[in-house]
């Protein structure tokens, strides 16, 4: 009898909480801090409850340290294309952190210049950022800042990733010819082909975060991009051959200590096949990627074991294709951010935040958030919350950029959100 009473009380509390959360269309107006998407039945909450514009990280960059998520915030509202480095009105951008248990927000950086970084090391509780030729680390617990290195004039470049134990940063050297092309042809539709065809010499470098020593480790006459250190192996770096995806074997890895010949992760097998938007699985054993065979016709998520080379491909519907996919921390499920009608899949029904489960050689999709009021010029870039109960994404469906989380399972209504 006592156990039944407890169950009834819990049920009553759950129903009461559910009734206090409004069910409504997502976006197209100012939203409350919490609501239930009327088209999916899933609960959505706003994580960045501050003024200005707030943007979470690119899909493969880990923003989580302990109970906090690092994000970029500015004092200017702008609902346009922010992507990775910011655009639109002049703004003062700094780094912030939101506590995923309390939703309290604190400012991490307060520089006289804009700070827009996505380099976070959970192992050392540091964020790394750069201003002109100087590279800094900031401990997010005590906010102590240290200078790591000042780049020599002959070796200027940009840092983009940190290794698993926080001892190495990696980036690419600047190229004057590439800067010239970008200056003369600022539209991606113009510069993308021009830089690819130029076959400029590109160089990857590392910086030791303890000694500040900068070392060039690999050069090639190819457009090297999207550097990502393994989340578990401090010496293993992934990079891509940028360019039109159907013309490049894109995804490569190399050991930054042994400096052996880079290893190709996926080789194209047919005309107009593409593989890209690659990311590391959390265990560091697999690299995942968007795979289309051929482009715009048949859609998969590919998964390659970096040690054995064994690849598995999982098919999904055209309408379920996403600009970016991401794997859960336990790698048992996937999520995706959907796409607009003008995206690669050209699906009129693709504007959703998706949750995917494996079903043999296919992926079974669940729609979590209707994104019809979101402008996909700002890519949502999904992340799993550390407890894997929520999918975190960025959106402009209120008319300003903010960061949100949608609950994967319906009907929980737990007061302990994360």
Label each PLM-derived region with a short phrase.
Residues 110-202, 216-219:
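Asp-box/WD-like beta-propeller blade repeats and closely related beta-sheet repeat scaffolds
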Residues 379-418:
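Blade-level signature of beta-propeller repeat domains, shared across WD40, Kelch, NHL, RCC1
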Residues 281, 285-302, 310-364:
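Loop/turn-rich, solvent-exposed surfaces of beta-rich toroidal or solenoidal domains
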Residues 53, 57-60, 76-132:
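Blade-loop segments of beta-propeller domains
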Residues 35-55, 98-114, 140-155, 206-223, ...:
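Multi-bladed beta-propeller domains
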Residues 21-34, 39, 43-93, 227:
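Beta-strand-rich domains and repeat architectures in extracellular enzymes and scaffolds
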């Amino acid at each position: 009898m006592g156990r039944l009473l407890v169950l009834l009380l819990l049920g009553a509390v759950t129903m009461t909480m559910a009734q206090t959360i409004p069910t409504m269309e997502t976006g197209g107006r100012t939203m409350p801090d919490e609501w239930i998407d009327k088209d999916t039945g899933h609960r959505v909450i706003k994580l960045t409850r501050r003024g200005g514009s707030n943007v979470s990280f690119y899909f493969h960059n880990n923003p989580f340290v302990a109970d906090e998520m690092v994000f970029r915030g500015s004092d200017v509202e702008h609902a346009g294309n922010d992507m990775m480095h910011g655009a639109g009105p002049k703004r003062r951008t700094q780094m912030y952190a939101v506590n995923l248990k309390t939703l309290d927000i604190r400012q991490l950086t307060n520089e006289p210049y804009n700070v827009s970084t996505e380099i976070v090391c959970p192992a050392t509780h540091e964020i790394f950022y750069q201003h002109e030729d100087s590279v800094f680390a900031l401990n997010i617990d005590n906010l102590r800042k240290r200078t790591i290195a000042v780049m020599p004039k002959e070796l200027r470049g940009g840092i983009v990733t940190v290794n698993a134990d926080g001892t190495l940063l990696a980036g690419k050297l600047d190229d004057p010819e590439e800067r010239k092309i970008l200056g003369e042809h600022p539209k991606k539709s113009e510069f993308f082909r021009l830089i690819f065809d130029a076959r400029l010499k590109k160089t990857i470098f590392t910086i030791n975060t303890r000694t500040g020593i900068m070392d060039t480790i690999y050069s090639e006459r190819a457009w090297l991009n999207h550097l990502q250190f393994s989340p578990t192996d401090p010496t293993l770096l992934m990079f891509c051959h940028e360019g039109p995806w159907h013309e490049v074997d894109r995804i490569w890895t190399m050991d930054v200590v042994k400096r052996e010949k880079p290893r190709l992760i996926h080789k194209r097998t047919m005309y107009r096949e593409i593989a890209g938007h690659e990311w590391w699985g959390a265990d560091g054993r697999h690299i995942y990627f968007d795979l289309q065979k051929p482009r715009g016709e048949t859609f998969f998520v590919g998964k390659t074991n970096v040690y054995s080379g064994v690849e598995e491909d999982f098919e999904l519907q055209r309408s379920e294709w996403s600009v970016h996919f991401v794997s859960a921390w336990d790698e048992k499920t996937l999520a995706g951010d959907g796409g607009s009608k003008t995206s690669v899949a050209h699906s009129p029904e693709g504007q959703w935040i998706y949750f995917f489960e494996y079903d043999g050689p296919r992926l079974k999709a669940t729609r979590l958030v209707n994104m019809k009021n979101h402008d996909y010029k700002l890519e949502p870039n999904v992340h799993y919350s550390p407890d894997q109960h929520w999918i975190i994404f960025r959106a402009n469906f209120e008319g300003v950029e903010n960061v949100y989380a949608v609950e994967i399972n319906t009907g929980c209504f737990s007061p302990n959100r994360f």
